[in-house]
């Protein structure tokens, strides 16, 4: 069985199943999970929905490379990345990033690294529907600053 699970899907994900898979090995001492959700407010406007597009082969390749970099840098055991695409409503879960390791420090750092690179380097395109209309979301300076520390 592989120690990496990567999925890009329209349907909601099961956090509990992903967590169980991450932490089922007896050598795991720490499991760190991040779950991102659709916010109801962005850039000062009320958000009603978010539409995510991607190119499947490109996206899966980018996610696989990001996870491989994390595994090369930290002593981690399992990684699970699930990213949703399609139409999402306010409050819906968008992304799950989970990392297990023998020690918490490795798991925390690897999880944050994966999330930072996923947010800036994975080819997802986001269109928000707000009270002001629709708009494509661009990368923020803070996202690039997060990458610079790695």
Curated annotation (Swiss-Prot):
CDD domains membership: MoaE
Enzyme Commission number(s): 2.8.1.12
BP-aspect Gene Ontology terms: Mo-molybdopterin cofactor biosynthetic process
SUPFAM superfamilies in UniProt: Molybdopterin synthase subunit MoaE
Keyword list, A-Z: Molybdenum cofactor biosynthesis, Transferase
Protein's pathway: Cofactor biosynthesis; molybdopterin biosynthesis
Positions contributing to substrate binding: 37-39, 103-104, 119, 126-128
Annotated signal peptide: none
Transferase found in the keyword field: yes
Enzyme class, spelled out: transferase
Subunit structure: Heterotetramer of 2 MoaD subunits and 2 MoaE subunits. Also stable as homodimer. The enzyme changes between these two forms during catalysis.
Family: Belongs to the MoaE family.
Protein's UniProt name: Molybdopterin synthase catalytic subunit
Species of origin: Pasteurella multocida (strain Pm70)
